[in-house]
């Protein structure tokens, strides 16, 4: 896990949009997805699910977010 992964995770939770995170961070959407996938592989659980409204954080992501938010 690295700072970029934490920053992308945090921004994705806050915005609910890979597109917005990519625009804010001046990265491609594919790049954001790759960072999220690498992060999920590193921590061993899924952070988001896709639904008709966009990305939905998993229950594990909500718990993890509380830990991450304390570090920012």
Segments predicted by a language model, with ranges:
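Alpha-helical linker/hinge and terminal dimerization helices associated
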Residues: 42-43, 64-72
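A short LG(V/I)-centered, amphipathic sequence patch enriched
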Residues: 40-57
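Short helix-boundary/capping micro-motifs
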Residues: 11-26
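Helix-turn-helix DNA-binding elements, focusing on the entry/boundary residues of the two helices
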Residues: 17-18, 36, 50
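Residues within the DNA-recognition helix of helix-turn-helix
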Residues: 28, 35-38
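Short alpha-helical "packing" element that flanks the helix-turn-helix/winged-helix DNA-binding module
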Residues: 8-12, 64
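The DNA-contacting recognition helix of HTH DNA-binding domains
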Residues: 3, 29-30
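Short helix-coil-helix linker/hinge
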Residues: 1-4, 19, 58
């Amino acid at each position: 896990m690295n700072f970029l992964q934490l920053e992308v995770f945090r921004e994705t939770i806050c915005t609910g949009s890979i597109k917005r995170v990519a625009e804010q961070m001046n990265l491609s959407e594919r790049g954001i997805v790759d960072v999220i996938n690498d992060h999920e592989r590193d921590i061993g659980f899924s952070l988001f699910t896709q639904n008709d409204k966009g990305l939905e954080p998993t229950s594990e992501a909500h718990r993890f977010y509380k830990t991450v938010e304390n570090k920012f």
